Amino acid sequence: MSILEQIQGGADLRRFSLRELEQLCQEIRWEILRVVARNGGHLSSNLGAVELTVALHYVYDLPRDKLLFDVGHQCYAHKLLTGRLHEFPTLRRAGGLSGFPRRQESESDAFGAGHSGTAVSAALGFARAARLLGEDYHCVALVGDGAFMDGPNVEALNDAGRSELPLVVVLNDNTMSISKNVGALSEYLNRLRSNRGYWRFKSRTAGFLKRIPGVGPALHDAVYSVKNAVKSLLVHGQFFENLGFTYLGPIDGHNLSLLIRNLTRAKNLGRPVLVHAVTQKGYGYKPAEEKPDKYHGVAPYFVEREAAPAPGFDACAGQTLLEMAAEDPAVCVITAAMRDGTGVARFAEAHPDRFFDVGIAEEHAVTLAAGLAAGGAKPFFAVYSTFLQRGYDQIVHDVALQNLHAVFLIGHAGLVGEDGATHQGAFDLSFLTHVPNLTLLAPSCAQELAMMLRWAKDAPGPVAIRYPKAESAAAHNIVPLQKGDWQVVSVAHRAQAVVFAVGSMVGPAMMAADTLALEGLEVEVVNCRKVKPLPDRMLEKYARLPIVTLEENAVLGGFGAQVAVRCAQLGLGARVLPLGIPDAFIPHGTRAQQLAGCGLDVEGICRTLRRLLGADNPKDALEVGRD
């Protein structure tokens, strides 16, 4: 039996020797590699955090003590150490383990995560709750150096440092978030981790003191307690101490002995402590060590594809931006630590002077875009839908209120598959359609996206373009945007209903119309590529027919709701049936499974239209079609 198979929690860890714990770390790595190879997932970050996670579980008593992950990209070892080994092969699969911490999954998952900037605030909340309720437990926030730059984490550090509560923040410093870290805080950490003079001084002094007969260990501890005074002479700036934290580090994040010793000391201090551990992303797996960014989030890589994938929306956006930049020197691009994921890495290489990676700081990114626009530039902010939520106030107050020409490229809109509930792009249509001055577009294919980008470059006011994580659908005969807000893409000569489809739903709607046509039901499909403002002329044209709206967005407050409201305002008396994502957080699974579960796959759309037209099955549909 392996050591890992004997572990159900921290108490089990404490039965093993240091050498056995090091063996356990290797077993954990191989299990992570085995499962991620088949299921996909976050590989590099998890491989780099194994020793750190084992040490945390060794020192702290979970679930009584609270361990909180920021983002949660590093939680796989934690799951394996808390009784989920036999479920681990279900990672990121429908009905299986989530790829992120999830309170509903285990009592050892103290707080759910998926976005950055949450762990320190929530851990401080736990610590204050413990004091209020007279409970006695320890709180630890594990934060990566990329997420550490996020504004809410800095705000929480500022609050926590003066609290005098027993809160430990562990900085997992692997020198890399999804994209290269940027900014002054990142440079500060670089100085801390690379100050060889401090490391040499500390090592030599400790060795000398411990060798003094009789009093060596005690003298070492006494000197160690005043090390901050020495450190301040050798390391420029005392950012964490100035915030009120006791700073321990930097320490080797792959040395179990050092980790256990420092975490134990932090635990016993009983006040705010920051433990700075330097780790290597992908540690223990050479390909991931050499290219950690490529192994950050990976698809299953033991699966053979039958054909090459179609061009993606992100790649199309990046290529079109490159072409526009060659034509217009005012074009510039902003991203929030996601240059690869949003498809703009090539733009960054070609135009470093016109590319701004602000780190994990979406709020700042939006207002930066506003300032660039006010100054005469043409900014494009490439961001995932789920992360744009963080900049909502800035969209309203800084961009739309001033009617500034900033363009938001909203990728991963709709259902995103295995990353699950925390990463679904289910709300952008709802929170953007009611913002005045803003034009909202949704392409049905990559070619339409390219056309929209070129149109948006010189359009008045703010523009948002949302597109899915999915591969691009095949192009249809696209009419230029200037010649029509909406485009009829599937014509029915004696239409019995019309489908207003948005973006990624256009392809499935057309396939559903083809299927129903074989059953004698005639349904017209409209590509509603301009979601806001709505074209009254098209609403008036189709008001006599039953209208089904299709969107990969929350049905509450989404496109369908806007269509129903506008039809009512125009007094059209239209019958509108909105279809979209239900009022629920959609769990992880494949994108196809999620679409089917929401009734947004071809069969689900056909089923809804048959029911609407009084034909509950294909046989009934043939009878209705003859009427």
Role assignments for model-derived ranges:
Residues 261-264, 296, 312-327, 343-349, ...:
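Glycine-/acidic-rich phosphate or pyrophosphate-binding loops and their flanking alpha/beta elements
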Residues 219-287, 405-410, 429-478, 602-627:
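Structural signature of the thiamine diphosphate
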Residues 87-97, 162-176, 197-200, 400-412:
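A glycine-rich helix N-cap at a beta->alpha junction
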Residues 1-82, 239-261, 269, 273-277:
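N-terminal amphipathic, basic-rich helices that act as targeting or association modules
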Residues 301-303, 309, 417-419, 439, ...:
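Peripheral docking tails and interdomain loops at the edges
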Residues 42-163, 331, 335-336, 344-345:
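Cofactor-binding active-site loop characterized by glycine-rich and histidine/acidic residues
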Residues 65-66, 271, 279-389, 394-403, ...:
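Non-catalytic terminal/interface segments that mediate subunit docking, oligomerization
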Residues 175-317:
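Long, well-ordered, tryptophan-enriched scaffold segments
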